[in-house]
Amino acid sequence: MILITATPGGVTSNLMTYYAKGDLALSISMTSFSTVLSLFFTPLLLSLYCAGVPDISIPVMIIVQTMLVLVIVPLIIGMSVRSKWPGFAAKTTKIFSLLGIIALLFLIITGILSNLHAFADTERHGVLFYTMVLSLTALGMITGIILPKLAGVNNYQTRAISLESGLRNASLAMAIALLIQDLMGDFYGSMFVTSGMFGLGMYIAGLICIATYKKILPVEAEEVR
């Protein structure tokens, strides 16, 4: 649970925001900001929360290197392309975002299928476990609606904030879990299962939001830019 909550947002939230007709620029900005911060906070939070757990060693450098390759470098490339060729970036963003979603979903499903033995541990991964994992997305999205509305944020931006709050980079969490499994002992199975189930659940939650935001967060035509 700590691993998935410590990871940043990803391209999924950006694409979902686009289809939900939310503030895409805000979504991309939040994703970029959280991604940069995660390079420091993801290994830090894992180290702090696992400090008192026996037989657990958090490989900080491995986590940082993984995030640099899978998250930071692509982010820098994307921002550079958007800065130098804004027209090209605007035309191809939706296409590459959709391809990225398909690729990430494929990786999540493939990872789950190749680690079915971890899911078979029903004593550890029972109904309560899956309920807690799947409720993370719902809790994040609900909080992402309530707090902005209390602060007077318009519905157009609230849609983006809600999706950004509930959706995480599950593929990054799964990659980290796989790379550090030898150092995590008995906790590896739970880390991987949590990340995989969250990854599948967030796609379903995102589609539900796209279908319901029109009613619960109506947007005036002049708000959409």
Task: List PLM regions with ranges.
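Alpha-helical transmembrane segments of multi-pass small-molecule/ion transporters
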Residues: M1-R225
